[in-house]
Amino acid sequence: MVIHGCVDGFSRVIVFLKCSNNNEALTVLESFQSAVNTFHYPRRIRTDHGTENVEVARFMLHKYGITTNPVITGRSIHNQRTERMWKDVFAYVLQYFYNLFYFMESQDILDPDNELHLFALQYIYIPRVKWALDYFTLQWNNHPMSTQGNKSPLQSWTAGFYEFAESNYTVVRDVLDVDTINFDHYGIDDDGPRPQIETSNNVVVPRSTIQLSMEETRALTDEISPLSEDNDNGVHLYQRTVAFVNNFFDSDVESS
C-alpha cells in the first residue's frame, strides 16, 4: 500500500490524500487531475525527486511552459508544511494500521512473502485506509489554526483568492473567471515540446501476481465487503478473504 498526498503551501489545505496498491506516476497524476476539479490548477508545485511525481511534473511543464518554472524539486525535508502533514497522517491514521499489520504478522496471520496474503490484505485494508484518510482530510481542512486567526485551512484557501480578486494572477483568474475558460483546450499545446525530466528517487512496489477473473471478482465482492464490521479490526474479514480466494485455486486444480 502506498499513500500519495498533496497540500497547498499557502493555506495548508490537503488537496488530495490517497491510498493505492502501486507507486506509479500515472496513479499520482490521476489523483492530481481529480483534485484540480475542486481546487483548480496551481501555478507552481514543489515535489521531491521520486519518479512517482514525474507525470505530474511533466503535466505542469507542458501546461505552463519550462520558462515559467512551474515545478520545483528538492528534498522533501524542505517542504515543511507537507512534512508536518505527513507527521500527523502517520500519527492519527497510519500508525494504527502499521501496528495492526505487525501484530497480524507476529501471530502468523499475515505472511508478507505470501502473495495470497498480500492480495487479501490489500482487498480488505486499502478501502479502510482510504476511508480513514478521507475522514482525516475532512477534519484537517476544517480545523481552526491559531496562526491564521482561527480560520480553517479551507477558509484560508478561499480567503486567499478573494484577497487577490483584483489581481491578474493566473491561478486566481482561473478560479474566479471560470466562464472565460475553454475547458476543451485548457492547457493544451499540441505543438509544444515534451520536457525531459530527471529523477533520482525510485521506489518500486511490485504488483500482485494474483489476477481474478471478472466472475471471481464479482463473487468475492458479493461475499465479502471490506468495510463491513467484523468486530476484529478487519482481521476476520482478511482471513475469510484468504480462504475464499484460495478456494478459486483449489477449484482450478480440480478442474485441470
Regions found by a protein language model. Name each.
Residues 1-150, 207-256:
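RNase H-like DDE/DDD metal-dependent nuclease/strand-transfer catalytic core used by mobile genetic elements
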Residues 128-180:
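Hydrophobic, mid-to-C-terminal alpha-helical segments
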Residues 170-209:
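Polybasic, proline/glycine-rich intrinsically disordered low-complexity segments
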